[in-house]
Amino acid sequence: MILISQNITNYDIQIPENAVFRINLAWVNSINELKKLLELHKAHDIFLDLPINRTKPPNNRYSLEGIISILQDHNNVKYLAVSNVNKKEDLDEYITKIPKNITIVPKIESSIGVDNIESITNKLEYKERIIMLDHEDLYTDLLKL
């Protein structure tokens, strides 16, 4: 998978046809802006990053309930990254509510999440399981040990 950040749009760089376009909702200011981004990149599969319990700026403005209709209306959203997954139970609400055509990607940002990574991945019922490790937050947490 070639995963391209939304930051690439700040430069005059062509997005490869087979790339998955990542949109981090921490950097999207409104639902209307998200809809425009999804429409602009409708030719690409989308990896949507939903920051939950984000403590550093910019703070997340969205909840799962707030984006469910977006997920249902945009078939090109193929992945949803969920921040701060520390244990398998953190995924329960997402597994229940997210459309089945979207792959949930747990984002591990703490040593607790690393310790529970096997049970977290086993909770996912996909042929291919994807985990995202947040290098900055995870590194900061590991330094505290």
Predicted regions located by residue number:
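Conserved alpha/beta-domain cores
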Residues: I2-L145
